[in-house]
UniProtKB/Swiss-Prot annotation:
Optimum temperature is 26 degrees Celsius. It is found in: Nucleus; Mitochondrion. Disruption phenotype: Increases the total average mutation rate 17-fold. No significant abnormality in lifespan or sensitivity to oxidizing agents such as hydrogen peroxide and methyl viologen (MV); due to the redundancy with other DNA glycosylases. Its main location: nucleus. This is Endonuclease III homolog. GO terms for biological process: base-excision repair, AP site formation; cellular response to hydrogen peroxide; depyrimidination; DNA repair; nucleotide-excision repair. Its EC number is 3.2.2.-, 4.2.99.18.
Length: 298
């Protein structure tokens, strides 16, 4: 009986050790990749940087109007390129984009303004329904909670999280769109099948300080470098460690040099105490230096 108990403890410890190693490796991976992506993004001007939804509302409008415009921009953004969305928002603002103005439009006229936004006919209806709800139930403003925003027609979790961040200045979750979902899985940070599952997984993996910037960072990276089709793996700084890279051994025409990136992390160790069935957790800080091949300027 005693030996059997000992075997169980040893087996349990082994499983815990493997799990700890897996988590530690994933933490090192995403921290390394984020630093490399930030380095690449410094030289990129992506559509999201100049035409993202955070750029489309009138900064001089009254706060409730500004918040409504942020909401509208995000409602139009799904299945729509930033350039098309920005143009549609300009047309709406030229007509005076407010709750009252949206309610004055006839649906066919609103459709004409929104076209060629993706699903513009459906979104025209959503906009009018949302405007009526905001007028009747929110005194002409937008909800200030995630649940309240998600209850509006045509508003999902990604939009709601971005509205909270942009309009209310509050980050309550990670906004996961197709770029964030694709890239975080390509890099091997997580293994998920839907954006909703990706959000939950990333919110466990990433510290809250990264929840807001990760969307903008990965969206721009996905637009310019890690595209859905034919990603530019040959010039990506993550290509040597990315499990999805098609160019792990590809050298650029310029000379390669080495760059060391120090990744700081806290790792929680779990071990068995001498007393049976008593576990102790300790936190230790580690530093990992990762050498990544990058390209020097000629």
């Amino acid at each position: 009986m005693h030996s059997f108990s000992m075997k169980r403890v040893v087996a349990s410890s082994s499983v815990a050790a493997v799990a700890t190693c897996d988590v530690e490796g994933t933490v090192v991976a995403w921290r390394r990749d984020v630093e490399l992506i930030r380095k690449m993004r410094k030289d990129m001007i992506a559509p999201v940087d100049t035409m993202g939804c955070h750029k489309l509302a009138d900064p001089l409008a009254a706060p409730p109007v500004h918040r409504f415009q942020v909401l509208v921009a995000l409602m139009l953004s799904s299945q729509t390129r930033d350039e098309v969305n920005a143009a549609a928002m300009k047309r709406l603002k030229d007509h005076g984009l407010s709750i009252g103005k949206i309610l004055e439009f006839k649906v066919p006229d609103l459709e004409t303004i929104l076209c060629p936004v993706g699903f513009y006919k459906r979104k025209a209806v959503y906009l009018q329904k949302t405007a009526k709800i905001l007028k009747d139930d929110f005194s002409g403003d937008i909800p200030d909670s995630l649940d309240g925003l998600c209850a509006l027609p045509g508003v999902g979790p990604k939009m709601a999280n971005l509205v909270m961040q942009i309009a209310w200045g509050e980050c309550v979750g990670i906004a996961v769109d197709t770029h964030v979902h694709r890239i975080s899985n390509r890099l091997g940070w997580i293994k998920t099948s839907t954006p909703e599952k990706t959000q939950k997984a990333l919110e466990i993996l990433l510290p809250k300080s990264e929840w807001q910037p990760i969307n903008h960072l990965l969206v721009g990276f996905g637009q310019m470098q890690c595209q859905p089709v034919r990603p530019k793996c040959g010039t990506c700084l993550c290509r040597f460690t990315c499990p999805s890279s098609t160019a792990k051994n590809v050298k650029s025409e310029t000379e390669e040099t080495s760059t060391s990136i120090e990744v700081k992390q806290e790792v929680e160790d779990e071990f068995e105490d001498e007393k049976p069935a008593k576990k102790i957790k300790k936190t230790r800080k580690t530093r990992t230096k990762i050498e990544v091949k990058t390209e020097s300027e000629t």
